[in-house]
């Protein structure tokens, strides 16, 4: 699926990138739960698959976007992260991914969401840069710290802190442990 879903990004940018994002977030957990695969090199092939779907998203920027400033910001964010992934591959230091956050992905999502309701050509230079800065500072830096510095796992967090179970609890048991939380998450 991580090879197929991204192919829909140029035609259906928002739903396809969101599906790719969810698959990216869930694949390690799926592999851990349902296979006996050795996941020692997971970070490396995960980054390669990220580059694959984000490359398609980057190409979709040129195909679909109409705001020149947003295109230029997306280009910078894309290449900045690409340099970071390359440095990570060379040095195998997780902090590098914190310094070079994947702001491009969420910027793409924000632009695609804006595009569903408004004409993005109306976004000012200041608004585009402000949006990218907001995503970088308040969303991506904390998230990259959580993943690459603290090395926390989102699925473990959900099971322990949201559903009140242990990380090894099955998802079926975790969800049934707190049905009100499950209902609230679905309703949101």
Where are these regions (language model features)?
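Membrane-proximal helix-loop-helix units in multi-pass membrane proteins
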Residues: 56-121
């Amino acid at each position: 699926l991580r090879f197929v879903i991204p192919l829909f990004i140029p035609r259906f940018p928002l739903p396809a990138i969101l599906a790719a994002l969810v698959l990216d977030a869930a694949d390690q957990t799926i592999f851990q739960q349902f296979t006996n695969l050795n996941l020692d090199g997971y970070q490396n092939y995960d980054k390669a698959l990220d580059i694959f779907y984000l490359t398609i998203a980057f190409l979709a920027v040129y195909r679909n976007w109409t705001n020149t400033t947003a295109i230029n910001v997306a280009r910078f964010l894309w290449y900045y992260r690409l340099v970071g992934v390359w440095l990570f591959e060379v040095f195998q230091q997780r902090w590098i991914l914190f310094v070079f956050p994947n702001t491009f992905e969420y910027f793409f999502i924000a632009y695609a969401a804006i595009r569903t309701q408004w004409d993005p050509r109306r976004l000012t230079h200041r608004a585009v840069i402000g949006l990218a800065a907001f995503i970088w500072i308040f969303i991506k830096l904390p998230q990259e710290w959580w993943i690459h510095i603290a090395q926390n796992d989102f699925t473990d967090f959900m099971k322990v802190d949201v559903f009140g179970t242990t990380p090894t609890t099955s998802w079926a048991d975790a969800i049934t442990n707190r049905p009100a939380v499950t209902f609230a998450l679905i309703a949101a």
